[in-house]
Amino acid sequence: MKKFLRFIFRIISIFYPYWLHQKLVFVKDACYSMWIRNFLGKVGERSTICYPCQLQGGGQKNIYIGNNTTIQASSILGCWTQYGQQQFPNASIKIGDNCSIGEFNHITSCDKIIIGNGVLTGRYVLISDNNHGGLSAEELDINPINRELKSKGGIVIGDNVWLGDKVSVLTGVHIGKNTIVAANAVVTTDLPDNCMAAGVPAKIVKKLS
């Protein structure tokens, strides 16, 4: 049975080669981008939003994407203008030109997130300017999903920043231009221009000249 199935799929691969699959994925993502851009504030020229992309928070019109930027598949863009009884009318996400946002990224804002030009992110990156409640005894007795959103301020990521796989950038952080953040790091404080950071919490491990 196993040999038979291998034979069948070998035949299928002749009529449906991988290059054709890639072409069809390209067409699918182009069509999907033309559809989903109608729900956002602005999507620039030659930008692609790959299928699927989940929009959360009700503030889709406050999401702006620059030119020649790609949002890879299975990403989540959450712009929370309302969460329960809370109102965040100025919540926004702005992504610059020539960026590549990796697969399974989660970008969530109730304040503001600004991502500069030429930014590269790996897979499973979290960029969040908010969290669910604090650490008081009263809040801990509430289910996390029902706690109020709290933010220490917006996030700014400078031009040409590279965030490795599974990096988390948390509320109130500013990352300077040309900075590299190693995989699995958790950024809780500001990072200057031209440095490499790693660890939990992220610390500067090298200055880049």
Protein language model regions, located:
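Domain-scale signature associated with acetyltransferase and cell-envelope carbohydrate enzymes
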Residues: M1-D129, I155-D159, V167, K177, ...
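A short acidic, glycine-rich active-site loop
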Residues: P89, I142-I155
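Short, flexible, mixed-charge acidic loops at enzyme active sites
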Residues: G133-N143
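Conserved beta-strand->loop/alpha-helix structural units within folded catalytic cores of enzymes
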Residues: D165, L170-T171
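Active-site/ligand-binding-proximal alpha/beta "capping" segment
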Residues: H174
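Active-site nucleotide-sugar/metal-binding loop of Leloir-type enzymes
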Residues: T189
